[in-house]
Amino acid sequence: MQRNILWISVVAAFGVFHFGECTYQDSGEDSSSMTEESRCDGPPHASRGLMNIPGWFYDGSRDQCRRYHFPDQQFDMAKNKFKTVTECRKSCRSTVPLQCFKKPPQTIRTMGLPVSTYNSTQGECVTIAVRPGQTGPNIFRREVECNETCRDPEYGKCAPLHIVDCGGSTGNHYNLDKQTCEKTTKNKCGPFATLEDCFKRCARYIQRKCNIPLLKSEYCDIVDLRYWYNSESKQCEEIMGCADDVYNFPTAKECWETCSSKEESRCLQPPDLGKLGIGRTRYYYNITSNRCLTTTHVAFWQNTEKKNNFKRRSDCENTCRPKHKDVKKL
């Protein structure tokens, strides 16, 4: 894997580093009235050095504070370079209360009272149980209050309130109920000029990422293999992407199991293995390891066209492990 990559121009590689995630991740939101707008513009601040200093930067296209490793430890208050996610949120995402990222204490449902809290990892207000009389950050008695305080401000342009009446049909918008981006209907104006802009901003709120165009984050901290579901070919394709991408899947298994089925793809069927250990060499797809492995078959006359059993390795690879044309080896 590689780190600190600009997708437009690959300029450096700094090794590998894995890090833990917050309980409630930063799912992103619009902040048009930012207190330090210039600091939040553009790419993560590029500087010289050989260090790997963890920090954060604000990604305007995703409207999200993202992890990044910088080559030096100088944090300039005027640059898109932050020591903590809280500092980034205060500077670039000030329209969303910081309480919306707090995880409140919970108790057993049978002993507590149901309240609503905003889960920024899921991008929605969920019901939890708290002790009777419990108050504090990110605890709301009603879901509508949670939506108004946290969800809608964080969704920003993806929120329903950004679709307004107008004289003609203009722009595109995010349909919260359908969880997809679409062209705005007649006499309504959407906040996005293109569907791609909408998906870039709102894809993090889509739970089933099976109809999202091929998108990649412009700036990468860690470059890794990712898996994108091609809704036309109905296959999970291997691509190069960021480890924290919100447009695709981290594993082929998750991609196949989310977007396809045993009836639709033989790649999801249990492997058709030979039982005698003799016969002609055949191939099957192991979805867990994402590999095409060998087996043997005596009953070569059987029709295996719809089974997880392939005559040639290339047939297995092309069917279950297709690579998008831009994929390069790490």
Swiss-Prot record:
PROSITE patterns: BPTI_KUNITZ_2. The keyword Disulfide bond applies. Saliva (at protein level). Salivary gland. This is Penthalaris. Glycans are attached at residues 119, 147, 286. Keywords: Disulfide bond, Glycoprotein, Protease inhibitor, Repeat, Secreted, Serine protease inhibitor, Signal. GO terms for cellular component: extracellular region. Residues 40-92, 100-150, 158-202, 210-259, 267-320 form the BPTI/Kunitz inhibitor domain. Anticoagulant protein that inhibits the activation of host coagulation factors Xa (F10) and IXa (F9) by the factor VIIa-tissue factor (F7-F3) complex. Does not inhibit the amidolytic activity of thrombin (F2), factor Xa (F10), trypsin and elastase. One of its GO terms (biological process) is envenomation resulting in negative regulation of voltage-gated potassium channel activity in another organism. Disulfide bonds join 40-92, 65-88, 100-150, 125-146, 158-202, 166-189, 181-198, 210-259, 220-242, 236-255, 267-320, 292-316. GO terms for molecular function: serine-type endopeptidase inhibitor activity. Gene3D superfamilies: Pancreatic trypsin inhibitor Kunitz domain.
